[in-house]
Amino acid sequence: VARPIRRILYATDYSKASERALDEAVNLARQNDAELLVVHVIEPVGQYAAGEDFGGAELYMRIQEVNKRDAERSMQKLMRKLQQAKIRAQSLLLKGIAHDQIVRAAKNRKASMIVIGTHGRTGLSKLFMGSVAGKVVSLATCPVVTVRGR
């Protein structure tokens, strides 16, 4: 017997692929009168990216701060959009490795399913980049709906 869908975790990186997944998440939430849990994960900036020669630690902290501010701003915009669409939603900004945090949040918040966008990478770029969606699919304990970005 299928369990009722009460809470849908929608994972976003604020990309075009994520926007398509949002449409799907909103439709599923409407059809099931479910709550949407909107999750964005702020991944740590590689220390090497800041560069030791350029004030390393200080620059690293500044980059992290800007990323956090941008993520908060994007989340507020998204939540306003959902509110206008009359969708029950909660937001969750997390720090860490995206696929780990998404899977953990789904489990901790008892999500019935996860909706996530894929960038539709194939071949070598997928092999090297890996895929957050792919990792979520293989690690999640609930159903995962992937929505292709193109």
Give each language-model segment a name.
Residues 2-58, 81, 85-87:
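Small/aliphatic-rich secondary-structure junction motif
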Residues 42-43, 68, 97:
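Hinge/beta->alpha junction and helix N-cap segments in small-molecule ligand-binding domains
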Residues 1-4, 31, 77-114:
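Structural beta-alpha unit
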Residues 45-46, 99-101, 123:
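Generic structural signal for helix capping and beta-alpha/helix-loop junctions
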Residues 39, 90-94, 145:
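General small-molecule cofactor/ligand-binding pocket signal
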Residues 4, 27, 104-150:
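Gly/Ser-rich helix-loop-strand patches that form or flank binding pockets
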Residues 57-73:
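A short acidic, glycine-rich active-site loop
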